[in-house]
UniProtKB/Swiss-Prot annotation:
Family per record: Belongs to the GHMP kinase family. IspE subfamily.
Function: Catalyzes the phosphorylation of the position 2 hydroxy group of 4-diphosphocytidyl-2C-methyl-D-erythritol.
GO molecular function, one term: ATP binding
Organism name: Acidovorax ebreus (strain TPSY) (Diaphorobacter sp. (strain TPSY))
Enzyme class: transferase
Protein name, per record: 4-diphosphocytidyl-2-C-methyl-D-erythritol kinase
Pathway the protein acts in: Isoprenoid biosynthesis; isopentenyl diphosphate biosynthesis via DXP pathway; isopentenyl diphosphate from 1-deoxy-D-xylulose 5-phosphate: step 3/6
Reaction(s) this enzyme catalyzes, per UniProt: 4-CDP-2-C-methyl-D-erythritol + ATP = 4-CDP-2-C-methyl-D-erythritol 2-phosphate + ADP + H(+)
Transmembrane segments: none
Highest taxon of the lineage: Bacteria
């Protein structure tokens, strides 16, 4: 196998997000449920025998924080693989949205190259590499929606009685974006939420908890409030995902979403029972 085309990288929604503390090193401790949705970036991979890693959609110098290239190089370094790859990314998931697009791209890169380069790493081995790339990347390797704790490193798949029921969601990304660092460094951020339980979440699912980052994000980005108010005008209860600026609401009745501001991204999404690449890795 010398190439893989049309490899999906799904977005996520945080059904709730509680900040429960802060470690001495400054990292915040979180609790959240990460839910996979069918809004996907699409990646393409072609093996190169010279060991180089390139991106066809970036004609200028690669940014130092490009997660897709970092993921490929981290996998090379961890395994000593001499092969390279040429990567294309068709971006559909908006950036600075709290939807995890960049992290999902990195995870799909690890899964695809593990297969293309015939490395046969387990899910846990890929998880160790993913931890070096960013807090959300390990989740996208776990194969399904999950309960996530710590700094994103404690991940439990939602299965059996805790599995999420099928549902549709209106996802709205305002024109403005947000830098995650601005929110977590803000003095007004709530950092002492009580710890939740999976059983407590399972009792209400899509109505559980809140997003502790949302008040700060709304103060920094008024468009978030505008988007939530727009959803409420449709009879939908909106909340922010991740660190924003995207918001979402479960769709429980017929609703017309065609009058949103032209600069907003509005998409109706369904949750995914499993990651589309869940069976590409064992363990």
């Amino acid at each position: 196998m010398q190439a893989l085309y049309d490899v999906p990288a799904p977005a996520k929604l945080n059904l709730f997000l509680h900040v429960t503390g802060r470690r001495p090193d400054g990292y915040h401790l979180l609790q959240s449920v990460f839910m996979l949705i069918d809004w996907c970036d699409v990646l393409h991979f072609e093996v190169r025998g010279n060991g180089t890693v390139t991106r066809e959609d970036l004609t200028s110098a690669l940014p130092a924080d490009d997660l897709v290239v970092r993921a490929a190089r981290a996998l090379q370094k961890a395994t000593g693989c001499p092969q390279g790859v040429h990567i294309g990314v068709s971006k559909h998931i908006p950036a600075q949205a709290g939807l995890g697009g960049g992290s999902s791209d990195a995870a799909s890169t690890l899964l695809a190259l593990n297969r293309l380069w015939k490395l046969k790493l387990s899910r846990q081995q890929l998880h160790s590499i993913a931890l070096t790339l960013g807090a959300d990347v390990p989740f996208f390797l776990c194969g399904a929606s999950a309960w996530v704790e710590g700094i994103g490193d404690i991940i439990r798949r939602l299965e059996l009685e805790h599995q999420l029921p099928p549902a549709a969601f209106a996802v709205v990304k305002p024109e403005a974006g947000l830098d995650t660092r601005m929110i977590f460094s803000h003095p007004s951020l709530k950092r002492d939420s009580s710890c939740a339980t999976i059983s407590g979440f399972a009792a209400t699912h899509y109505q559980f908890g809140s997003n502790d980052l949302q008040p700060v994000a709304q103060a920094l980005c008024p468009e978030i409030t505008q988007a939530i108010n727009w959803l409420e005008s449709k009879g939908l209860q909106g909340r922010m995902t991740g660190s924003g600026s995207a918001v979402f609401a479960q769709i429980t009745h017929a609703v017309d979403l065609h009058d949103a501001p032209a600069a907003w991204h509005v998409k109706v999404c369904e949750n995914l029972k499993s990651h589309p690449l869940a069976d590409w890795v064992f363990g």
